[in-house]
Amino acid sequence: YEDWRLSDEERAADLAGRLSIEEIAGLMLYSPHQAVPPMPGGPFQGTFDGKTYLESGKEPYAISDQQKEFLEDEHIRHILLTNVESPEISAKWSNELQKRAETLPYGIPINLSSDPRNGAKDSGAEFKSGGSEISKWPEGVGFAACFDPEVAGQFAKDASREYRALGITTALGPQIDLCTEPRWMRFVDTLGEEV
């Protein structure tokens, strides 16, 4: 599976044949939401050698006990990032996770994902907090109101660059849903109901 000269199908079949059912199951799951660093009292808490982040003296990008557990024992590689202290901390944390994953059997990399982070207004919602140092853009409804696909295209290029710099490999925001229920939390992420 590590031989780049083989086809994707051959490599996948070889890797799948080496994995246990538990390892395969872990690769199909997502982690709980991850805040970096996980603050005590917050919704996404974590410990470092049994201590809270503030008590531990660890760097803000250190891997928590819980993160080590889901990487090593539960074989999870899909991770949902929520709050981050800063883009720099996010990038360093992502690098630490990737280094850790490389040392584990099979060296399967991390797939770090995020809900939208570039909304023009900081709502305070944990899924949209990306640090104030990234670009701000309209939500989906705002792009639809522009009636200019080039604006949306430029956003996609900018957000892609920023996400990769943060270590994020999967954006969970793009939606093609037509929203007809205004009470739905994801309404602003769609292009509206009259597209």
Language-model region placement:
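N-terminal beta-rich core of secreted/periplasmic extracellular enzymes
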Residues: Y1-V195
